[in-house]
Amino acid sequence: AYGAQDGSNEDLLYLNLYYDPINEPLEVAEPGNPTLSDPNRWQPLSLARFIDQSGNEIPGSSPPFLSPEWGNVVPFAMNANDMTVQERDGDTYRIFKDPGPPPYINMQDDPEGSALYKWGFTLVSIWASHLDPANSRIVDISPNSIGNISTFPQDFEDYEDFYNLYEGGDPGQGRLVNPATGVPYPEQLVPLGDYARVLAEFWADGPDSETPPGHWFSILNYVSDQEVFEKRYKGEGEILGDLEWDIKAYFALGGAVHDAAIAAWSVKGWYDYIRPVSAIRWMAQQGQSSDANEASYNPNGIPLHQNYVELVTEGDPLAGDQGENVGKVKLYTWRGPDYIEDPETDVAGVGWILAENWWPYQRPSFVTPPFAGYVSGHSTYSRAAAELMTLITGDEYFPGGVGEFTAEKDNFLVFERGPSEDLVLQWATYRDASDQCSLSRIWGGIHPPADDINGRLMGQEAGVAAFTLADRFFVGDTQLVTSIPDHGGMSLSLYPNPVRQGAHLSIRNVKEGEAAHVQLYDLRGVAIDVKEAITYREDILQLNTRSLAPGVYLLRRRDGSTQKLVVK
């Protein structure tokens, strides 16, 4: 079966073969983060009970990193040109669409990177101060006011101009007119506390919810079911039948999110970057880094921000009975699951808490996905899917100029009660939906900005490339292996097989005159040009595998004799 050959380690139930976390687990229910040894690397979480993606309860669990070696999986449209190879502790990591490292905290050698690290993770806590229905700020969440972002910052130093530190959101100005109707998009004014919570939970990938690629298949189904939508491939030509449309759309979207997963998780596994719950607690444990003349100063501490990040002083309600908390860092933020007894009736709200007790806006049985943060899988998946949807429908806009998803009052949120009133998530374009998905992970306390933008850029490339390849299948511009004939006589002999990437493969039982007629195919049936990599001497063909991405291939002689080749 293909799944046993695609590099996913299906035979061993997808277990990690060599990755090990460098940090000891964080006991999330306990204050602070005393077990973190490297504040730039991922930290497992120790939970009283963990409920996994499928809703299975695992008592007393510290979930392992999910798929840090996913760069070994055979991609759909990506190839060796998209890949770099790194080595750590003698183990190989294949990285697709490598964006380079995230900001690291190292005040001695990299004060600029340290400042970006501290700014980004502090922003996550500040945005969590919006997660309260009692928040008096009212925002317009219609396409009239959100979306329509044309460019992304290319450097971490430019992120402060893209993300609004105190107000939340991005520079998107929205669109005045719905192109499908020719009239302006009507305003939709709702409490920011409701919008941010609904957005975070709509796109969440916790227990009993869809994964990010699953969200986009649901969106594809939503689009396909709209009465005003015409199933024209690329928006052109005749209307396709339901079955043909579904096959093409599912095939192409599957290829896009498959490559997005490989790219994102290859980066996660290599850079192994820390999550906000670990970083925020660790920084606050160091102290504050804003004023050397104030209490608890430490260059690695969290920056102070009036009304959001402050020090506990004498007489503060958080000072403690014996003043034991005076000088500690406090945060004005979402107060966490300790303030929720019944999620159907309770709201944690926002207020001052000790920073050592900070939680992301998630359930205490999940807290944070069990894998590294950089880059955001949601950002990568969603941008890849948005590009694919734009290309396959021939229109960047949802049918009718807007996609709508309703959240009913007190009947949508799962982490706590809410929203406090009905609201409708509205996006004009697929890219607008993708961009809001990315922001949802910051409001949810799962990612800092550093995880986001590079994921979007990687997904953008992956989505376009996946559609380009899928289109070749649809229009017939591919050389396909449709069958593997059974021939008698001497079959091809390959050694070594598997072969390590970059090594020479010896191919026996090929006559000198037949060398030009040996063809290599990937498992999609697409021919790969290896003529320049083949030499012939002493009755043996030598194939240099340097240009081949790791994966499974079919090597075929002119008479149809075919052998499977595995490149490691």
Which residues does each PLM region occupy?
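Acidic/polar surface patches and capping/hinge elements
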Residues: 1-480
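C-terminal outer-membrane/trafficking sorting elements
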Residues: 485-568
